[in-house]
């Protein structure tokens, strides 16, 4: 079981919260790590206070704030800043969850499709509801690109509509697949090192290469943890821009 690269993604019940309609509601390891991620973010954002000379936590909080704010301005304009709480929350939650998941014997929340689909659907519904509320029927200009010849316009509109409703799929699967693949690769290399080490001195020598690869892969996963949070957030900003400026 220890060498099984899939075992690390297993959701286990920690305790039961009761039953609703005959269905048990349980607090799982996934729930625990979601709460842990939120707690870490709360400590980072609230604990430092406001100091003239910022400490480590305050510096991280301020850098994260400015990074996300600049991201929104560059993709959705100043009007997009009204969605700052949403984008910032998504970015921080995904980044912290990904980083926590790199620690051995922890759980990676974003490696489960149900989590990433939920986050992507939150963005999709926000875009759809706000776009219709703000623009009314003008929101449907999003599906009619300018400059398209009239004889292929129906086909283009059909493709645009399908593409729009498939956005939550690509938005969620990208994060899920990257985190799943990365952690499986780490587990495979780590298990290989353990098996070689069990062979004695000869195995230790042979384990040098996979150990180096594991270290390099871990460093890459640290980069991917931030990169995937950034990609999810920047795509959120792009989708929000479609709702704010559907005719552009």
Swiss-Prot record:
Origin: domain of life: Bacteria
Entry's transmembrane regions: 25-45, 83-103, 113-133, 142-162, 192-212, 215-235
CDD domains referenced in this protein's UniProt entry, alphabetically: ATP-synt_Fo_a_6
Topological category with respect to the lipid bilayer: Multi-pass membrane protein
Location within or outside the cell: Cell inner membrane
Self-association and partners: F-type ATPases have 2 components, CF(1) - the catalytic core - and CF(0) - the membrane proton channel. CF(1) has five subunits: alpha(3), beta(3), gamma(1), delta(1), epsilon(1). CF(0) has four main subunits: a, b, b' and c.
Entry's family note: Belongs to the ATPase A chain family.
The name this protein goes by in its record: ATP synthase subunit a
Species of the source: Rhodopseudomonas palustris (strain HaA2)
């Amino acid at each position: 079981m220890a060498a099984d690269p899939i075992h690390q993604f297993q959701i286990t019940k920690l305790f039961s919260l009761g039953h609703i309609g005959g269905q048990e509601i349980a607090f799982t390891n996934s729930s625990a790590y979601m709460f842990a991620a939120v707690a870490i973010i709360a400590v980072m954002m609230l604990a430092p206070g406001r100091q003239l000379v910022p400490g480590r936590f305050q510096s991280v909080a301020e850098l994260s704030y400015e990074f996300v704010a600049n991201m929104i301005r560059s993709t959705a304009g100043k009007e997009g800043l009204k969605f700052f709480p949403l984008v910032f929350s998504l970015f921080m939650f995904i980044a912290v969850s990904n980083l926590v998941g790199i620690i051995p014997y922890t759980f990676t929340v974003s490696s489960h499709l149900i989590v990433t689909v939920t986050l992507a659907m939150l963005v999709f519904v926000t875009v759809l509801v706000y776009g219709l509320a703000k623009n009314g029927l003008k929101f449907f200009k999003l599906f009619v690109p300018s400059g398209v010849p009239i004889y292929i316009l129906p086909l283009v509109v059909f493709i645009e509509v399908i593409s729009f409703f498939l956005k939550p799929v690509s938005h969620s699967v990208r994060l899920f697949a990257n985190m799943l693949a990365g952690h499986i690769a780490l587990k495979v290399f780590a298990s290989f090192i353990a098996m070689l080490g069990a062979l004695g001195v000869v195995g230790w020598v042979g384990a040098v290469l996979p150990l180096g690869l594991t270290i390099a892969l871990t460093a890459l996963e640290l980069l991917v943890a931030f990169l995937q949070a950034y990609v999810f957030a920047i795509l959120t900003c792009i989708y929000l821009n479609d709702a704010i400026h559907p005719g552009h």
